[in-house]
Amino acid sequence: VVIIGCATWALKSDNMARKADIQAKTSQTGRKADAAKTSVENGVQANSEAVKEKTDDKDTSDTTKKTETAEERIARVRQEAVTAGYPEKVIELLDKNPETVQFVEDYGKKKDQAPAATVEAEDGYSGMFPEILQWDERWGYSPYGTSIIAVSGCGPTCVSMLVVGLTGDKTVTPSVVADYATQNHYVDENNDTTWAFMTSGVEHWGLTCRESNGNESEIAKELEAGHPVICSMRPGDFTDIGHFIILTSYNNGNVTICDPFSLENSKKSWNYSQISSQIKAVWVYSK
């Protein structure tokens, strides 16, 4: 009986030991699970805080952009462009025309995009001619010579307006014209469009060109006949160096123009006698 009693006690003791061991392991496992849960929760919280911080930063940035003045925006875009290492000529667009601020701001993310295939119907028109801008993001980032259309492409942009207006072919975009001019050596080492492009170059699209002396009565007659005029401009109201613009209509001494670099200029009516002294060369076009 004693032996049996000892064996029974030993068995109970052994069972108690195993139970204690199981409880200890269970407790340890529970602590590990709790620790893991806490770690996950902390990680989720940290991640949530990081996301919130980024969102807050973005919201702050968006709010800043919404509340900044035009001058403040230009200053911000200029600083961002300098920091990002944008080409100097691109940054200089801000000094020449504040209207280009969106183009400059988007340069980094859009400079390698493919140009638009057509001039769309929603583009504004001056009579029969679309008012196309060389710094339009649809083609302004495209190359011209060793530059880009936004910086140096006033010539190709003027020709694009002529071709679309006179022929109705909306696939002749500034980038198409710039490619043709570059490939056929109508752009010089300074990325300026040669005058030869305004005469022989436009024949590629079936246009007829003749030079004019710029006499006001002659200009009035040609414009009234529906013949647009391209002018090469000296420094003055339109440029500091050189520029091309289109005259589209004449009325009582005033002309309407398409300036490929300035929306503001294109919206004005200009007294021909005021700008005639700034004209270097004149070409008249027809289909």
What do the predicted segments below correspond to?
Residues I4-Y186:
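Active-site-adjacent structural segments surrounding the nucleophilic cysteine of cysteine proteases
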